[in-house]
Regions:
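RNA-interacting cores
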Residues: 2-266
Length: 266
């Protein structure tokens, strides 16, 4: 008390009220099957392209310029992602599948792309891919100003399937939400080159299934399970051509190699 004025007293803070109660997020997990609806183009960067990025491509000598520009067999092998062990030799980067789901969120009501990137996690680094690769040569346009035409050789899977393990944050997301999001990704985005997302192509699209909901797809799934590591390795070592145009181009390539007396070294 000061004079006739009564000074208010300060209440002591209760230490217990300052303790934050933080509950850990719960995580759900679901394993789903991806059954290819359209063929898959692999699009791994070649080892030569990676070396050129690492140390620079450099200018070609006159002798180097005499060599044939493309080596389709090597480009075919370089175009795939490979696993050192596992049921399959071929695989696809898990971030590519997650990216497809994030892109699909742009067209999916109730979820944002940023939320998918934060709340969904794929434990594996690569997703196993079943299916027999074929060698395919296509005409493409370079990214230079003149859009110069070039030829690109890639692994092409007419039929394919995959199995993906997806973890997600609960209760923000549910297993049903993950299935819906991956289904949308399979329909409007796809994976690999010339995928649906890019507009021009419609490749790499897929349907989403689970082990207990295969229905009429079970027969196709069982057949594709036989196209595993051994079959894929044989297909890379002794490639089959995907179409008549590729077969004609490869025949011309062999004739040109013979004319120039070029022998490929394995």
């Amino acid at each position: 008390q000061q004079g006739n004025i009564i000074m208010p007293t300060k209440a002591k803070a209760d230490a217990s009220t300052n303790v934050l109660q933080i509950q850990p997020l719960k995580q759900g997990r679901v394993k789903l099957r991806m059954m290819g609806s359209t063929p898959l183009y692999f699009n791994s960067m070649s080892s030569k392209a990676m070396r050129d990025l690492l140390i620079g491509g450099g200018k070609k000598t006159a002798a180097q310029k005499q060599h044939i520009k493309h080596n389709p067999e090597k480009e075919f092998n370089d175009s795939v992602y490979k696993k050192p062990h596992g049921e399959t030799l071929l695989c696809f980067p898990a971030p590519g599948v997650k990216g497809a789901m994030a892109t699909a969120a742009l067209e999916t009501e109730g979820i944002k792309k940023a939320s998918v990137q934060r709340l969904i996690f794929l434990p594996q680094t690569h997703v196993q891919i079943w299916g027999k690769p074929q060698l395919k040569i296509d005409i493409v346009r370079s990214s230079d100003m003149n859009r110069t035409p070039d030829m690109r050789t890639r692994a092409y899977l007419p039929r394919w399937c995959a199995e993906v393990d997806i973890a997600y944050v609960q209760p923000t997301l549910s297993a049903h939400a993950i299935v819906s999001l991956l289904t949308n990704a399979g329909a409007i985005v796809g994976i690999g080159d010339f995928r649906q997302e890019k507009g021009r192509g419609s490749f790499g699209t897929f349907q989403v299934l689970s082990e207990d909901s295969m229905g009429s797809f079970q027969k196709d799934w069982d057949e594709l399970m036989l196209e595993d590591r051994d079959v894929q390795q044989e297909a890379l070592d002794n490639p089959e051509f995907a179409d008549e145009q590729t077969a004609e181009l490869m025949q011309y390539m062999q004739e040109e190699r013979s004319r120039r007396d070029i022998t490929l070294v394995a």
